[in-house]
């Protein structure tokens, strides 16, 4: 048997979420996966395209995240966009659910990684950015980049 991995190994980052949402709180959750999904994740074959977290019967599920089928899975493959259960404490689930219902926030996946050999997802309680907020972010990023370029020249 192979030695256990230590530390974190990043699988994928949801860059679009950072652009579309303002993150208020972040949580780490475990993922309930099938074997072929774990193997596919290790190859980095995941897309967050329209991913979000839905609360149902006191549990949290990640919806709309595409994990590509593992080629060597044979008959034991998985459905690419099935809802995946998140492993969180009940208090965390209830706190997020209340904020989503009352304040009109949403919960989105931010990144997927392996921590000590186990698949984890970082989810964030987020508020959607308005178009002008996104423009302001782009402007400030451009100004920072220009300033750094000028400093490097001199």
Curated annotation (Swiss-Prot):
Q: What are the alphabetically sorted keywords of the record?
A: Cytoplasm, RNA-binding
Keyword Repeat set for record:
no
One annotated GO molecular function:
RNA binding
Q: Which GO terms describe its cellular component?
A: cytosol
> Domain of life here?
Bacteria
Q: Which PROSITE patterns match?
A: SSRP
**Gene3D superfamilies noted in UniProt:** 2.40.280.10
Q: Which SUPFAM superfamilies match?
A: Small protein B (SmpB)
Q: Where in the cell is it found?
A: Cytoplasm
The reply to whether Ligase figures as a keyword in the UniProt entry is: no
The record's annotation in InterPro entries points to: SmpB (IPR023620), SsrA-bd_prot (IPR000037), SsrA-bd_prot_CS (IPR020081)
- Please give the biological process terms from Gene Ontology that the record holds: trans-translation
Pfam families (UniProt xref): SmpB
Q: Which PANTHER family match?
A: SSRA-BINDING PROTEIN, TMRNA-BINDING COMPONENT OF TRANS-TRANSLATION TAGGING COMPLEX
The record's family statement is: Belongs to the SmpB family.
What role does it play? Required for rescue of stalled ribosomes mediated by trans-translation. Binds to transfer-messenger RNA (tmRNA), required for stable association of tmRNA with ribosomes. tmRNA and SmpB together mimic tRNA shape, replacing the anticodon stem-loop with SmpB. tmRNA is encoded by the ssrA gene; the 2 termini fold to resemble tRNA(Ala) and it encodes a 'tag peptide', a short internal open reading frame. During trans-translation Ala-aminoacylated tmRNA acts like a tRNA, entering the A-site of stalled ribosomes, displacing the stalled mRNA.
This chain's protein is named SsrA-binding protein
Annotated organism of origin: Solidesulfovibrio magneticus (strain ATCC 700980 / DSM 13731 / RS-1)
Its taxonomic placement starts with:
Bacteria, Pseudomonadati, Thermodesulfobacteriota, Desulfovibrionia, Desulfovibrionales
Q: Which gene encodes it?
A: smpB
